[in-house]
């Protein structure tokens, strides 16, 4: 392998090398320092006379006397069934004290977009055990659904709870979770590792942890390693895989950092103009392929800077993905966990995975009625602030009380509370029983007579 000493400039995580031979985009590079140690990098850009290399570690010690070796290969992820139960670094190295992974295959981490013609329609309900997701914003197998959160909100706890509890009820098919955390603190890393080991969820999971003090370049690689692992488990070993990515905001900040080092012309709020395309290359790797038994479902968590849902990161994510789950600061202040606000939340594929044969025949109608009742109660809170509660009619006071009950009984649940979909539906009916039947306008009469607590007691 030829070694060149043609480095002209080092800027942040980037090394600029005078071109001496044809090199490929994303080709791996070994950098040999004066003391004989090696660092690894990847070709980020190439022109007629200059190659830009992004280094996976710090660039400390790299100078004009550093040797550069182009390997002719791209980054490949060693994959195998033995990965289940392992905790890896953001670069795919063992972090749990275990041995290196014995690969059954080595796959390129860039993956390939699923051919639209080959995509199957998402149909199967995934139970997370969280009522506000399962009943009102259902996650469907093969869907990509982001969780919009904010700084200081318990999105990590929600992510861990979903990773522990997610399952396809009534199915004996193989299910796995791939969990990738980007830009987390050492404290969060310890929390994630301890929680996975405490609950036994690690048995059917592969965990990737990238720390805040790890290089920004590694943060770009981490979700691609996770998705490559998920695709292997899903499409070659027939697993149904749930991929949880947190925090995509840290990923986008790494994109911005590298773009600034390359002196690119910035887009909105300093983020690269290609951020939409880059995010799509990750999100679109979720799905189902016709003729394959497995599936890849994505839950990506991002913190909205300043709780601004119009910020480029949540804004662009919303265009690519199929809905959003919104974590709310007001609910968090009330001490409600998980503080998920169902009103701005949406699952665009919900109707494909609910109803008779999937969950229960009353699922859609109960969800609509709960949503309508809660929305009316929240609107009335604004009116009460102006005219006072005494000015409300008896009907309005009923909906005001319903909104309080909805938050405190339906939204609120324990961090280890795993509700089945039947339990969530029965709880929904229990809340609706206090609303006069003539006001349950979104539920068919036959469903009321079958599932309403008043009629169920008579039947018993």
UniProtKB/Swiss-Prot annotation:
Protein name: A-type ATP synthase subunit B 1
GO annotation terms (biological process): proton motive force-driven plasma membrane ATP synthesis
Gene designation: atpB1
Cellular location(s): Cell membrane
Domain of life of the organism encoding this protein: Archaea
PROSITE patterns: ATPASE_ALPHA_BETA
Record flagged with keyword Cell membrane: yes
GO MF term set: ATP binding; proton-transporting ATP synthase activity, rotational mechanism
Pfam family, one: ATP-synt_ab
Homology family: Belongs to the ATPase alpha/beta chains family.
HAMAP family tied to this protein: ATP_synth_B_arch
GO CC field: plasma membrane
NCBIfam families xrefs: PRK04196.1
Primary location: membrane
Keywords linked to the UniProt accession: ATP synthesis, Cell membrane, Hydrogen ion transport, Ion transport, Membrane, Transport
Entries under InterPro entries matching the protein: ATP-synt_VA_C (IPR055190), ATPase_a/bsu_AS (IPR020003), ATPase_F1/V1/A1_a/bsu_N (IPR004100), ATPase_F1/V1/A1_a/bsu_N_sf (IPR036121), ATPase_F1/V1/A1_a/bsu_nucl-bd (IPR000194), P-loop_NTPase (IPR027417), V-ATPase_su_B/beta (IPR022879)
Membrane topology field: Peripheral membrane protein
Source organism of this protein record: Methanospirillum hungatei JF-1 (strain ATCC 27890 / DSM 864 / NBRC 100397 / JF-1)
Functional note: Component of the A-type ATP synthase that produces ATP from ADP in the presence of a proton gradient across the membrane. The B chain is a regulatory subunit.
Oligomeric and partner information: Has multiple subunits with at least A(3), B(3), C, D, E, F, H, I and proteolipid K(x).
């Amino acid at each position: 392998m030829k070694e060149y000493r043609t480095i002209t400039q080092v800027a942040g995580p980037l090394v600029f090398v005078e071109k001496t031979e044809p090199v490929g985009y994303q080709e791996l590079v070994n950098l040999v320092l004066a003391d004989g140690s090696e660092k690894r990098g990847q070709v980020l850009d190439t022109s007629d006379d200059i190659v830009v290399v992004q280094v996976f570690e710090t660039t400390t010690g790299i100078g004009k006397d550093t040797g550069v070796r182009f390997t002719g290969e791209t980054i490949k992820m060693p994959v195998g069934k033995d990965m289940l139960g392992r905790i890896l670094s953001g670069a795919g190295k063992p972090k749990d004290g275990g041995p290196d992974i014995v690969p059954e295959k080595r796959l390129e981490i860039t993956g390939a977009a699923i051919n639209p013609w080959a995509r199957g329609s998402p149909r199967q309900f995934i139970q997370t055990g969280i009522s506000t997701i399962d009943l009102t914003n259902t996650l469907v197998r093969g869907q990509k659904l982001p969780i919009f959160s904010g700084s200081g909100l318990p999105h990590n706890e929600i992510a861990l709870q979903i990773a522990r509890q997610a399952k396809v009820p009534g199915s004996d098919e193989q299910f796995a979770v791939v969990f990738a955390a980007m830009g987390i603190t050492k404290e969060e890393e310890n929390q994630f590792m301890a929680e996975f080991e405490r609950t036994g969820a690690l048995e059917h999971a592969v965990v990737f942890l990238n720390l805040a003090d790890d290089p920004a370049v590694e943060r770009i690689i981490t979700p691609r390693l996770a998705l490559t692992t998920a695709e292997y488990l899903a499409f070659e070993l027939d697993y149904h895989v749930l991929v949880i990515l947190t925090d995509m905001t840290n990923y986008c900040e790494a994109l911005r950092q590298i773009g600034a080092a390359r002196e690119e012309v910035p887009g909105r709020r300093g983020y690269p103009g290609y951020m939409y395309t880059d995010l799509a290359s990750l999100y679109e790797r979720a799905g189902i392929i016709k003729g394959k038994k497995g599936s890849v479902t994505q839950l990506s968590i991002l913190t909205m800077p300043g709780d601004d849902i119009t910020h480029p990161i949540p804004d662009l994510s919303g265009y690519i993905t199929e809905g959003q789950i919104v974590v709310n600061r007001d609910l968090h202040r009330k001490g409600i966990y998980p503080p998920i606000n169902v009103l701005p939340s949406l699952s665009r594929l919900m109707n494909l995975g609910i109803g008779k044969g999937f969950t229960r025949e009353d699922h859609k109608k109960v969800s609509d009625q709960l949503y309508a009742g809660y929305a009316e109660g929240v609107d009335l809170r604004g009116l009460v602030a102006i005219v006072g509660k005494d000015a409300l009619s008896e009907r309005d006071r009923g909906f005001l009380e319903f909104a309080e009950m909805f938050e405190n009984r339906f939204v609120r649940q324990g961090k280890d509370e795993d509700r089945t979909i039947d339990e969530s539906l029965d709880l929904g009916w229990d809340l609706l029983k206090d609303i006069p039947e003539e006001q349950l306008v979104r539920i068919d009469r036959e469903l009321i007579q079958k599932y309403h607590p008043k009629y169920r007691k008579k039947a018993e």
